[in-house]
Amino acid sequence: MDNNQKKFSSYVFLSSFGRNLIEDFIPIILYKCGFSLIEVIFYYLLVNIFSLLLSYPCVWISNKYSNKVLGIIGIISFAILQILLNFIYKSNLFIIMLSFMYALYRRGYWLSRRFYNLRVIRKQNISSTYSLISIINHLGVIFSTYIGSLLLDFLTIKILTIISIVLFLVSLIPLYLLNFEHKEKSCKLEPFKTFKLIPKSNIFLFGAYELINVIKFLFTMYLFIYVKDNFQTIGILNLITNLSTIIFAYLYGKKINKEKNFLYLSVFFVVIVYILKLNSTSHLLILASFLEGIFNKMYELSIQKNFYLLSKNFDYQNYNLVYEVTQNVFRTIIVAILYFFVNDLKFMIIIVLFFISFSMVFKFDSLLLKND
């Protein structure tokens, strides 16, 4: 790894540890504070709507000023989000404020992180570098959710939010130490032009992959409501999932370059594993969580290899914007369908898996890829 990759990896580790102490538990915190399941789904729908609306303004800010400025906006929004979680009250106004700050934090964080990901990963070793950064990310996540669950079960949310904010702030140090030979340059934002050039099968595959985040959100609620109503259960299962993710990324990450069937196999097994997890208890649930980490990472590496490879044909800002809009459109449409037409949590998960399974019908179009 070169110096920038090391600095970026430090940023990824610290920020991942800090935000995952509490982020996965937000829907459960709302549920425990008196919000109904459908109200929590409404909150998640608003998050995705705001995320979609904020996509262009956030990329404009990063293009006009810098992605580091956008990262600061993400940090400030994260801090406000944590403060709001300490003063929860049951009202639509609170849900709107919380969902907006969460969306702004996520856009500020992920747009800047993805931009620097695109810059530090070279075309010659995409899979190996991404696998290593991914391992570092999951090292930050692996214990953070469990530690967060312990703090929520035995202490107070105030202590957890303070720790989370401090770690997130510290993560800015390596981010600001990034130093590239070619400085960030503003460009003309032409997302429609970029969208037209990207093969539509790729657009669908990128969007469908992001539905995994919807599955994770729903499963967090499902496990708490129907399996065991404490934070530690979620923390332990997440620890198991992230452990298997690290093992797979370390052992098989480089093989993604050579294996063309990884995408189809990963989508198939992801759907099977989540169906297994949906119908599991006790030891089977632990096994399903372990397999979830393996096949989710297999799916992620298959998608991200093509995402980064294709990015070398475009300006990063426009490419980042198109991907951002794509993922938010897919999530918003699916969550809206769930909110307006489905009442059963288990059926919600099955519907999302159904849409993800369509990825097996498509394949990545590599006609645009440069051979340099």
Predicted segments, located by residue:
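Transmembrane alpha-helices of Major Facilitator/SLC transporters
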Residues: 49-57, 140-143, 236-256
